[in-house]
Amino acid sequence: MGQVARPPEDSVRQWDLPESDRRALLRWGLPHDAHMRPLFQEGAAPVLVPNLAGERERQVASPGERLYTLVHWGEEALQLRIGTVAGTGRVLKIQPKPTTVDDFHPDLRESNAGFYDPSVEFFSSSVVQFVETSWRCHVALGIAFELWQDPPEPDRPWEEREAWFSRLQACERIILEQVERIDSHVRADDTDTLWSTVVTELTHAGN
């Protein structure tokens, strides 16, 4: 499920990040898979500018903050980037603008009234924690994905499929509990965290 990708050393050594964050990136790099693809920026100056479109974004980032690009997440058309804030090392998801109900097809707007996906969201408390979580999820999700690819045959009793689905949910729960162990700001029981999205996105790929 992917290979290691490391950032350009000359650039990272100039980044305004805690030394432990720079060391983690240079030593371990990040996994490369179909959903989260490392996209390390060149140069010493952070290039990501968060769009503080509303209150939810301003709870996560502050005016004037800039981020170093680490990862391209999801489809290119979505322009989702994961970056680390210069000075603090916090890791955030950045997109050009919030996604609102106005972005849905007209037939879907009523059923999604009030939908709001902010342009800035918290991912991890530090690069160190993001790197460790990324690698541990990368390995664990490989096992969970194998389980997802091996469901009971359609003609088997419903109880077997229910048991299979329960095992898959248990795998996800274990993974998210380990994420919380690494970073206490990412609650295992909070389905709105981005790590929860990563876990369920990979194990339910194609559903």
Regions found by a protein language model. Give the residues of each.
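Compact, glycine/acidic-enriched structural inserts
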Residues: 89-147
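Generic detection of intrinsically disordered/low-complexity segments and helix-coil linkers/edges
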Residues: 9, 22, 62, 124, ...
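Surface-exposed intrinsically disordered loops and tails
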Residues: 49-55, 105-114, 156, 162, ...
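A surface-exposed partner-binding patch
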Residues: 1-87, 96-99, 173-207
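An amphipathic alpha-helical core segment
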Residues: 135-179
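Charged, low-complexity surface segments at secondary-structure and domain boundaries
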Residues: 5-12, 111-118, 149-151, 181
